[in-house]
Amino acid sequence: MPSATPEIKQRVDQLRSQLQKASYAYYVLDNPIMEDVVYDQLYRELQNIETQYPELITPDSPTQRVGDKLSEQFISVNHNIPLYSLENAFNLQEFARWQERWQRLTPDVTQFEYVCELKIDGSAIALTYENGLLVRGVTRGDGIVGEEITPNIKTIRSIPLKLALDNPPVRIEVRGEAFLPIEEFERINQEKQTAGESLFANPRNAAAGTLRQLDPRIVDRRRLQFFAYTLYVIDSPSTPTTQWESLEDLQQMGFLVNPNRKLCQSEAEVDQYYQLWDTERHNLPYMTDGVVVKLNDYQLQQQLGFTQKFPRWAIALKYPAEEAPTQVKNITVNVGRTGAVTPMAIMEPVQLAGTTVQKATLHNSDRVAQLDIRVGDTVIIRKAGEIIPEVVRVIEELRPPNTQPYQMPTQCPECHSTLVRPKGEAVTRCVNSSCPAILRGSLVHWCSRDALDIRGLGEKVVILLIDNGLVHSIADLYHLKVEQIASLERMGTKSANNLINAINKSKQQPWSRVLYGLGIRYVGSVTAKLLSDNFKSVEQLSQASFTSLESVYGIGAEIAQSVYDWFKIEANQTLIKNLQQAELQFETLSETPKYPPISSTPLAGKTVVITGTLPSLKRNEAQELIEKAGGKVTNSVSSKTDYLLVGEDAGSKLTKAQQLGISQLSEEQLLKMINPQE
């Protein structure tokens, strides 16, 4: 094989530099400088050159972020510097007592500063860089020994593979928090629910579980983020002298550092910061459960040192978790559209995080056995991550006499078929494809917002259609008549006409949405888009081999096998034929663009936040329009926000935008910006 010419080597350096700058701008600065299609083109060019000339591959190349599967176990390694946990304070009085303790140890210190940072609800990791290159990533573990997960760490785009320094220190260690943004957490749980799998209870568990995946490709698909918060410069005379300086140095090196930090001069300022974020944290795109307060001066930190468990110079000032006791009235099971049978605790209603909670998932029979939860038990429930209600524990001391352990049913409560628990799975399933619950779930999923988006066809109407024998499969929806629907309870001619129009309108939904609507196990909306981009028609996808499916970037073996198997089932082939006859879209159509080229729109490269209820557009529709026009939609208002799209009942985002002087748009103004001709 011929060696690479100087021109090829120069091109490789150029490509890496362009891709690294684009990645930094996108993931760290939140300010894209390159369109996705351009990034993908440059990435593929670099990948092709490295395939042809493997001697040019370097550890910091953008192509090396996602590697092959890890070995079947992680290697335990000692931390160079112990990764201590923090002492907790649950109110400002406990914080004041902590301050009194450290001041007694340093009576000569009269002037000091605190650095306040939000405590991110994720997993702590330690990164080692040598001569500017990432060489190791380790979990916290017990603080002394962690597990090396470097291939997984490399998939996190906000962690630089190479420091953005001309003359990097010989060796540094960076500590920080790997976490899942709320939107990504919800997307992952939606896909797990689609697949009939147990859901993650909260973003922290999801982040920890993701980091310990043996396949880096799965980690890459889950889009972890990373905030750096500690810097140790080893083997170098030039070291920062304060925590604040360290955070600024980390930013210079290319790390994402939480912008919501503050340098405080007094306990009163810490109090203000704590109270502010107790309210504002609900508007953040990630979960935070408190504030980390550190003494700023490193010399003072060194003077105070550590206890056996904690540093004396830092404390976690946490917000109280919302937990409450309630009584279990019943334990039932739900049968999902994939046949997954999920036990649910039905409880006396209780208020948590501003909502009334009376149901909590128990996930599967293993979790039921672990809790030993019984009807009549008093339990502690928590709005986990303020997202999913979960049963934390059973208070056995309050258990009534003569209660019986709960037994999972052996027959489906809907169709009475024998339930099975497939080998290697935690979930019990109904495998009867004619089960009414599976049909009901399939129809509701098909009509859902991210699938065919058939307005007016929710679960209640679906149940009416099934109970009256009008539909036996998804394809039957497209043969319904106005008079059939009008005869149903509480429908009438007007509602029936609206529903038929909505069903007919769904025939124009693109191939990616149709694919998602089919409900193939493990295929969520994002995966469906990946597949439809690579297989332009149902014929291409149904004839694809397992190998060609798995070779698609972002598609792992589990998804590939599920898709491959689904298209081999005769009933599914019949469903596809029937839907094709109903004129659904089973291929990617080339359309004349409705909107001007991205580069010519006023929204190109702009960041937009949406708040309130818009007059006609749904939030996901507005987001799609903005992104088609070259803009980017984020969840929270910051100094980087260009526009706030405002609807009715706008919340605190509007107040913050006004304080920052950010331009506001109405829906009408947005549509004129996107397409001035309309």
UniProtKB/Swiss-Prot annotation:
Q: Which GO terms describe its molecular function?
A: DNA binding; DNA ligase (NAD+) activity; metal ion binding
The reaction(s) this protein catalyses: NAD(+) + (deoxyribonucleotide)n-3'-hydroxyl + 5'-phospho-(deoxyribonucleotide)m = (deoxyribonucleotide)n+m + AMP + beta-nicotinamide D-nucleotide
- Give the SUPFAM superfamilies listed for this entry: BRCT domain, DNA ligase/mRNA capping enzyme, catalytic domain, Nucleic acid-binding proteins, RuvA domain 2-like
Q: Which annotated residues bind Zn(2+)?
A: C412, C415, C430, C435
**Any idea which residues are catalytic in this one?**
K119 (n6-amp-lysine intermediate)
Q: Does the keyword Magnesium apply?
A: yes
Q: Which residues bind NAD(+)?
A: D36, V37, V38, Y39, D40, S85, L86, E117, R140, E177, K294, K318
Enzyme Commission designation: 6.5.1.2
What InterPro entries does its record include? BRCT_dom, BRCT_dom_sf, DisA/LigA_HHH, DNA_ligase, DNA_ligase_AS, DNAligase_adenylation, DNAligase_N, Hlx-hairpin-Hlx_DNA-bd_motif
Biological processes, Gene Ontology terms: DNA repair; DNA replication
Start and end of every BRCT domain?
Answer: 598-678
The family database entries (CDD domains) matched by this protein are listed as: BRCT_DNA_ligase_like, LIGANc
* The protein's required cofactors: Mg(2+); Mn(2+)
Origin, by domain of life? Answer: Bacteria
Sorted alphabetically, which keywords does the UniProt record give?
Answer: DNA damage, DNA repair, DNA replication, Ligase, Magnesium, Manganese, Metal-binding, NAD, Zinc
Query: What is one GO cellular-component annotation here?
Result: cytosol
Keyword Zinc assigned: yes
Q: Family assignment? A: Belongs to the NAD-dependent DNA ligase family. LigA subfamily.
Q: What does this protein do?
A: DNA ligase that catalyzes the formation of phosphodiester linkages between 5'-phosphoryl and 3'-hydroxyl groups in double-stranded DNA using NAD as a coenzyme and as the energy source for the reaction. It is essential for DNA replication and repair of damaged DNA.
HAMAP family, A to Z: DNA_ligase_A
Which NCBIfam families does the record cross-reference, listed alphabetically?
A: dnlj, PRK07956.1
User: Know the name of this protein?
Assistant: DNA ligase
Gene name, Swiss-Prot/TrEMBL: ligA
